Amino acid sequence: YRQEKADKGLISLDGKPLEHWTLKETAKQMAVVTQFNQLQFDCTVEEIVLLGRTPHLSFLQKEKERDYALVQDALVKVDMLEKKTRLYSSLSGGEKQRVLLARALAQEPTLLLLDEPTNHLDIKYQLDLLAIVKELKVNVLAVLHDIQLACRYSDYLYLMKEGEILYQGTPKETITPESLQTVYGVQSQVTWTEDQQAMIHYL
């Protein structure tokens, strides 16, 4: 999300090199949810999500009815509408991540980037958050270190080591004893349940 430039090669968005996009244009197309973070100022849940409309507003332009409607829709999707007047700082870790996801959705992105969004969350909140993401009608590119969660909620996986993609494909194609040995240096047995969840046993 434009924090660093590529050492080599070209990164494109919709066929256009990323450096040719302005920051505002990029923010209209791409939204980001990072690892758990604590904002340093107090805002309500609704105010936080409304920040997602910033790329669509000109300088000093006030939000319109449509902006508030999109915020409400985003809060409904993450099941946080009833808490829209709560202070962000008063929420649990899982609730905060859902609010940040709602803010990203309010941007109306075509691509949603998730950088370890479940880090520091209890397992229930991890499952809740990824289940919400799975149901969204938007392209999602996520960084996850939990292999079994990645298999459960992903359609396509890239398995990387030291910045290089070594394996890619469907979860079943990608997560094998051979790939886990190569990438992580561990021996394992991988079995799959009827609903295509990976069961990994490390030897």
What do these predicted regions represent?
Residues 1:
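Helix-to-loop junction immediately C-terminal to a conserved catalytic motif
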Residues 9-17, 26, 86:
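Conserved ABC transporter NBD signature motif
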Residues 50, 65-83:
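Conserved ABC ATPase "signature" region
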Residues 87-91, 95:
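Conserved ABC ATPase signature
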Residues 106-110:
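A short, proline-enriched helix->beta-strand linker immediately N-terminal to the Walker B motif
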Residues 112-116, 121:
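Catalytic Walker B motif of ABC-type/P-loop ATPase nucleotide-binding domains
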Residues 177-178, 182-203:
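ABC ATPase nucleotide-binding domains
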